[in-house]
Regions:
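Alpha-helical solenoid repeat scaffolds, predominantly canonical TPR units
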Residues: 17, 21, 85, 92, ...
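Long, intrinsically disordered, low-complexity segments
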Residues: 11-12, 88, 162-249, 326, ...
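Conserved, well-structured interaction surfaces
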Residues: 1-58, 74-87, 91-106, 251, ...
Length: 495
């Protein structure tokens, strides 16, 4: 943070608008008492959301609880501690819960949204507190907040929550921000930076295949793509044991492939640095044309994988997406040698989550409806599971309750067998995977890693509280699949 970059601290224009809502509503002579109560509560909820954003970045904040006038003292102090910051935020949330209606129009805040926010704020507050009694109370408050949510259920069609199908009908969405095609184009949404840019002319020049049925069906400005690190956490159902395991640990993968050395796949790498001590490489045991390593990697996955990720040989927008060497959207599919060049995915994966399937392609000036999910019941349940894992430090019986709670999203969203974890360490392991995949692309993982690092212990690989977080020290990885789909390796992304 410096004079040119606020690192999220400078939200005071937003805070002023929240305070205006509160004060103008309270002073109104035209509003009913019921309307005043609801609007004041809405203002406090918005203020809490804004300060939570600042607190996650900075810890201590400058708390402004009224509209500042020109004659006011502007040399306001920081909160004396992080604990005090979260006390103020939680007070606003509790006031909001008391004043908000239980139900509301879509896109409008209600008391259940405030409870969902409280559950997550309590987790973060507990992570940054050194008071053991306070931590326990915060975990208990998080559980109670989620238990208080009424009228929402998990959506068995996970992907629909994030596209046109379930935007306004999903039983899981508590609060979302909606955009209308009347005043929204592709460039005004995340889709513009999540989809690639490729033409049949470029495919012809580079030698990639197959051609697209609709030329330029993908003509966006891709800025980021899912990493293999994320894909690793979408578990596979082992066809012998019926347990959820990592893709390269399943019986069907182990029995049909052979590990390779880096030297065995060096010809597939664009740069020798892509292969290192952490690389994985395999080949199929059979060279028959109808045997492909993709089948052993991508079949029988957590269902959220198919709703979230475009991968080699999947269909999207009525197009066959090929991300193997020589594929139409392979990481070098512009010039055959430069990964990620020309808005092509550098990891050989593309986002599917949060992509609408419209009659017209996603394009910068094509109108589109859109929405962002802010609070949903599944996320709240995962917050409850984490709070129960926190309480397991004081009461070991909470482990089974935590596992039962995160198994609800694991089985309903992922169609996976339930976790059978019984120890606190195993429960944390399975919970972290579950949160990673269920909340992918929802602005959660980085902040969760920080929180788990501050908890320490089983939440961060047995390390002391505040120690190094291994996931933040690990390089991003990609997958490379040979043109005949008999070999593959996982390599390190070069920047």
């Amino acid at each position: 943070m410096n004079r040119d970059w606020s690192w999220g601290f400078n939200q005071f224009g937003t805070i002023r608008r929240c305070n205006l809502i509160i004060e103008k509503s309270q002073a109104s002579t035209g509003l009913s008492d019921a309307d005043k109560k609801a609007l004041v509560a809405e203002g406090k909820m918005l203020r809490a959301m804004t300060y939570y954003y600042i607190a996650k970045h900075c810890g201590r904040v400058i708390w402004a609880d009224h509209v500042l006038a020109e004659t006011d003292e502007f040399n306001l102090p920081l909160t004396e501690s992080i604990d005090k910051t979260y006390d103020l935020i939680l007070k606003d949330i509790d006031d909001a819960i008391a004043g908000l209606p239980e139900t509301s129009l879509q896109g409008r805040i209600n008391a259940n949204a405030a409870r969902a926010l409280k559950s997550e704020v309590c987790l973060t507050a507990a992570a940054y507190s050194t008071d053991d009694t306070r931590k326990k109370s915060l975990f208990e408050q998080a559980v109670a907040a989620v238990d208080g949510i009424q009228g929402y259920t998990l959506d068995s069609n996970y992907g629909s929550m994030f596209n046109q199908d379930g935007a306004r009908t999903s039983p899981e969405i508590i609060l979302a921000q909606y955009y209308s095609k009347d005043n929204t184009n592709g460039a005004g949404t995340l889709m513009q930076e999540m989809l690639p840019n490729q033409s049949n002319k470029r495919l012809e020049d580079y030698g990639g295949r197959p051609f697209f049925n609709q030329d330029l069906v993908f003509e966006c400005w891709l800025e980021h793509s899912p990493s293999q690190n994320l894909v690793d956490d979408y578990l596979v159902i082992d066809q012998i044991t019926n347990q959820g395991v990592k893709w390269n640990e399943s019986t069907q993968f182990v029995n049909n492939t052979t590990p390779l050395s880096n030297a065995d796949v060096a010809d597939m790498a664009v740069d020798a640095k892509e292969l290192d001590d952490n690389s994985l490489a395999y080949q199929t045991n059979s060279n028959a044309p109808d045997v492909q390593i993709n089948d052993f990697m991508y079949k029988n996955r957590d269902q959220r994988f198919y709703h979230s990720i475009q991968y080699d040989s999947c269909m999207f927008y009525n197009e066959l997406i090929t991300l193997h060497k020589g594929g139409n959207l392979h990481r070098t599919a512009v010039d055959g040698k430069t990964p990620g060049n020309g808005y092509i995915p550098i990891t050989n994966y593309i986002w599917r989550k949060y992509i609408y399937v419209n009659a017209e392609r996603i394009f910068w000036n094509n109108p589109t409806d859109y929405h962002y999910v802010i609070f949903r019941y599944g996320r709240a349940l995962l917050n409850k599971a984490e709070a129960l894992l926190g309480l397991a430090q004081y009461d070991a019986s909470k482990v089974s309750s935590a596992v039962a709670t995160f198994n609800r999203t694991r089985t309903t969203h992922g169609n996976l067998p339930p976790s059978i974890a019984t120890s606190l360490a195993d429960a944390w392991h399975d919970y972290k995977i579950e949160r990673h995949v269920d909340l992918a692309l929802e602005g959660d993982y980085y902040w969760s890693l920080l929180r788990w690092g501050m908890y320490g212990g089983e939440a961060n690989h047995g390390k002391p509280a505040g120690d190094i977080i291994p996931e933040l020290s690990s390089p991003a990885t990609f997958v490379e699949i040979s043109q005949d789909r008999h070999r593959m390796f996982v390599g390190t992304v070069g920047y």
